[in-house]
């Protein structure tokens, strides 16, 4: 929990350490305001693209890998006192489940997974002020 509002802005990343049971499957992560349940952002990734890029890689069942996940761009205000909840599933409400379901499960290792969330702090001194000419409407 934070004692002041947080402005989450940009591309949050989640490096999720998993042990897949199959050469296939996916992870869907939803970031929520823990007080209201409002969805702040989401990320999804097929395990075969765990290293990023456009080429699928063969995944060896039982091998520990890190999925380099990136959330869709976020621009959200998280009020003071609110926390963040991450909900993980295999498909989420916006995506179809993988073709190999239910045989392509993954064991997630949260203790070595990391998340980075870009936050902008505003204190009044760093607010964007656009230069105005003397004839600008807000100077009249």
Model-assigned labels for residue ranges:
Residues 4-140:
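Glycine/threonine-rich phosphate-binding loop and adjacent beta-strand/alpha-helix elements that clamp
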Residues 1:
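Sequence context surrounding c-type heme c attachment/ligation sites in exported
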């Amino acid at each position: 929990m934070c004692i002041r509002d947080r402005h989450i802005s940009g591309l949050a990343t989640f490096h999720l350490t998993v042990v897949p049971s199959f050469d296939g499957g996916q992870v869907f992560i939803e970031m929520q305001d823990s007080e209201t349940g409002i969805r702040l952002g989401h990320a999804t990734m097929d395990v075969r693209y765990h290293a990023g890029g456009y080429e699928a890689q063969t995944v060896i069942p039982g091998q520990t890998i890190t999925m380099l996940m990136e959330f869709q761009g976020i621009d959200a205000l998280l009020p003071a006192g609110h926390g963040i909840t991450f909900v993980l599933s295999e498909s989420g409400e916006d995506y179809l489940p993988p073709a190999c379901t239910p045989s392509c499960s993954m064991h997630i290792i949260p203790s070595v997974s990391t998340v980075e969330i870009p936050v902008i702090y505003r204190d009044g001194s760093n607010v964007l002020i656009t230069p105005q000419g003397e004839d600008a409407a807000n100077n009249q």
